[in-house]
Amino acid sequence: RKNTVNVEDELEARKKSGKGFFGDNVLALCSKADIVFMGLHGSNGEDGKIQAAFELMGIKYTGTDYISSAISMSKELTKKVLVPDGIPMPKGVALKRGHKIEYVPYPCVVKPCCGGSSVGVSIVANDAEFKEALTEAFSYEDNILVEEYIKGREFSVGVLDGKALPVIEIE
């Protein structure tokens, strides 16, 4: 018999119940390990919260530190870090729930500020699609980005010990 748990639902239930972010004895168990392998994906594994808890407790772990994780999970913060250093980024605006945008250049991309794996992302070509995209993006969080659409191919480059790994095309 195989039991599966929706982690997002479990974390939300823990938050509402006041039980805390981690399951019973998780931090105590992790503190006994030589190193914790971070194999987590999504907002609760990549946003820096778990990494910060580990650092506060002196638990060694693999992967990115908590500040870098938090910045990387926020597309808005990432832009604020990269643009001043001359890294080209799509032009766009951050939009909070309830605020209006004066002008929308089509085509554009509408997406939640945080998250990954293209969750909540829409490519929009007109006003009707824009309205639907806003509803979709705001269903994930209260802060979204509206950016220019840049047609092209998508690539990913991992970095290990300061050295670029091979380029991988995302299809």
Please provide the spans of the model-predicted regions.
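ATP-binding N-terminal substructure of ATP-dependent carboxylate-amine bond-forming enzymes
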Residues: 1-67, 71-73, 77, 84, ...
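Glycine-rich phosphate-binding loop of ATP-grasp-fold ATP-dependent ligases
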Residues: 90-91, 107-136, 154
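Structural detector of well-ordered beta-strand residues that form the stable sheet scaffold
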Residues: 62, 90, 109, 145-147, ...
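Short, hinge-like loop/turn segments at secondary-structure boundaries
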Residues: 80-83, 107-109, 163
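Short beta-strand-to-turn element immediately C-terminal to the catalytic PLP-Schiff-base lysine
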Residues: 83, 95, 121-126, 159-161
